[in-house]
Amino acid sequence: MKHQPDYTPIITAWQQLPSDCPERFVETALMSEMWKALGITPNQMAGGKIGNGLSPDWLIYRDQDKSKPPVLVVEDKKRISGFQALPDAEFDAKCRKYNLYKQAIGHPVPNANNNGIRQYLDKSKVSPHLLASYGLVFNGDFFQLWRRVDGLVLPMTPIQKVTAASIPLIMKQLEYCLNAPTKGLVVGLWNQKGGVGKTTNIINLGAELALNGKKVLLVDLDPQNDLTRGLDAKSPNYLEVYTNKLELNNFKQAKKILEKAICTRDFTTSLSKQQFTISILAGDGKGNFLKEFRESTAHTPKTKRDAIAKMFSLLAEDYDYIFADASPNTDILTLGMIFGSDVLLMPVDFDRRSLHHASALHHNLPKWRALRFKSGKGELPCGPWNLGLVFSNCPSERGAILENYISEELKKLKFTGKQYKTELKVLGQVKIAEFEKKPVCCFDSNPAAAAQLYRELASEVFLDHNFTDY
């Protein structure tokens, strides 16, 4: 596709668009100009039914070969007065309250039987050859891109206000979706309370995804190096020389340094004897170079934070999933992990403190996204988004009283994110696997026990349809 950098026709068409106009007029007067500027021809567009009762407004293909799945599915809406009057700083939060936006997403709306992006990217509802990787909701006032990674559907950008000044940026974002290589999902597992099973979860979720044919990288950013020792891995000190290359804008050499530091481990499951490989960007086993980098005065805190975040961006093209482990302390390594993650999965146990810390992170994520979006000048993808709570170290018998305390505490904390049904119990096989320095699927003699729980969690969170917009 040839990109036309002159967005004047789009800006002019938008400026001439009435503040109240029907959906069809938004499509013919404005969106047709957008597709033209992106070099998209009529042979790259389609419409029609993609599943039972599912008929999006547009399917956009990378080229004229429609035997491959579309790259983008679009749901557009009419323009109504009121959106342009919303303050820029509050546009995302206030736009979410409008039924028109909710309908575009596919949220339930009173007296409406609507489908939207969450249905059009649902792998359980859409024919595989019509299932897109990206989604767009648009009405001439709001613009938001969405992303699908296996079964997980999540925002790729905040809700952006369409203005003459923002049109060049949103066009570049569309161009990214149409042309950029697909990047893997960067997942941070974190809670400010320690002992909630984040490292154990990373190792075993990574293993289950690798068993499903996914290319998985685990990154140890915790100076305790539990992940490194937990898989008997070791990497050379890469951070200082890598950061120096970044400061020179030598991204190619910076990535090569990371690639050389990555080690791999091969495993075999205990029951099916299935082989799989996990890649690890490890520490040195003692956490020395992570501590040195954290405490170094050779780089500013912002440089160190951005270097960690950029690491994920550089490596994401080579993996399906990247899982990052960081200290419970909010040091610069942890902040870099949060800043560079697409999503955060928050392990909690049946403890009031872990719920408190998870809820605090949940409420702070919009600020992190806004900072990342602003500092990255709209670079995609933008995160982190809240993937939800996973209960770890669960007692086998907890009773209704404890369940009620947990539920009431989350209500008090105003936690509105997801809570996964799969709960990870304390089982001996997990401890045996830790001593053997392998994932539990390599030492689980009971398929209904530990490994099965991680298998179910990997499916619930990543492989089966799972929608989040927190």
Residue ranges and their predicted role:
Residues 145-146, 151-470:
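P-loop NTP-binding core
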Residues 1-134, 148-185:
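A short, conserved, highly charged catalytic patch centered on acidic carboxylates
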Residues 137-139:
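Charged, structured surface patches that assemble and position nucleic-acid processing machinery
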Residues 141-143:
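Loop/turn residues immediately N-terminal
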